């Protein structure tokens, strides 16, 4: 590696950019895959990409990801780089809220017909795209989850409703997976007790009830962890909770730490209706859905977070800095932890070649998914310039494209994004940081880790080619480290638990030079597993608590230069 580095230095910065095709050690949510353009709103001429409800399984040492209405599925060797597989035999409209289960590395099973009536598909060679159907039909299955236990007994779980609970039944694996025994109701939402299950943005809807959906069963150390999504996929608070049992059919007990997968703050929001899988190093990873909800409510992206089970058997998912760069699953010993690169571009001045109507370039650095820059054309004359206002060490960039009247539907061959990103210290002499001029990849959420970090004050995006008739970008994010000081720890943390014990207000003294804060909380001082990112404020009202649960809170501050130590941890009864 040292010899390669010296060779690249000798060749100059354009050669450094070419090195980005080498393996990356980090990733950044949302996942950068070639999302399918949806067809189930095509009758309204609404065009958008989406990926949701990921079912990720390991099969013979590699990984397969099944995603709602994608007309196929993805394959990966490392959970980082994914290739799309167009199956030869599949559900005609694509699988909906699919399930997948690996049975002893011999057969991979999949379910998820959008009609709710379906055969279980199976394959011993999913790379080939060849599947067969069991000669039986199972009915009335919404968001199915197939699980085969170590003893060979098979179960089907399902549920997607604001009325009906998660249900389950045993199947006869040796008799065409026909139902065996009675349907059993396992559990439903309990909104009067569980604040996070309430509907609406920030759980604010007091009229409509939440939805329970997307069951996914994980077995760990003899315990069964039934994960479920709530309260609504279009909201920032979409999350996964978990119940625990000693048997697949229950009885199930609500885990004290809930929700387990929760990301209501920051750039990308939501972390619900997911699946949990063991990665290349044996660590657990949780995949889930994140909300865009611009063109339609069901416009979504996928995310991946490190997960695990602590010494007390508590399941958790780490979403702290969940849309910042993290170590990739295959990097030994890192367990997907936060890389330590900060956001350099937040609210920095932006200029652009052109802008159409109200969609100006300021949207590119506001950390809001629902705003975007729209150029007057989609040609090579379009550019964006971000002034970081002072030099910083740039380590990675992320370009999040947006669909504005794209007029594309289904799987379309040959889509590609081509662009160049340059860096400069003075605004006059430019070096290529990212070179996608010859790319044949479809990269709607392109994240690139620079092979060699560079010092720059100005970052320039130059468009070459996009697959859509309009050039629209939601966010151009620049990651790295400034040369200043990280903020000090927040002081004067105060907690006010409301009369409605599902709600709490967290306050702290503003920290000079802080860009934002992470509110951390959990059921014990050593179990602060939950995190809520807050920009430009020193107060947070949360409506996600369990009424009879005690909690511990802390707050950390961050800026372009790093992260503070957490504040003192405070207890609220």
Language-model segments: residues:
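Pro/Thr/Ser/Gly-rich low-complexity, intrinsically disordered linker/stalk tracts
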Residues: 479-513, 547, 561-573
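Extracellular low-complexity, O-glycosylation-prone stalks/linkers
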Residues: 513-532, 536
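Beta-rich carbohydrate-recognition and catalytic domains
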Residues: 20-207, 219-266, 281, 290-333
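Short beta-strand elements bearing conserved aromatic residues within extracellular beta-rich modules
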Residues: 169, 419-421, 517-519
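Short, solvent-exposed loop/turn segments in extracellular or other extracytoplasmic domains
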Residues: 380, 441-447, 533-540
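Aromatic, loop-rich ligand-recognition surfaces of beta-strand-rich domains
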Residues: 368-432, 444-489, 497, 509
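Predominantly extracellular/luminal regions of secreted and cell-surface proteins
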Residues: 167-179, 334-366
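Beta-strand-rich modules
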Residues: 542-563
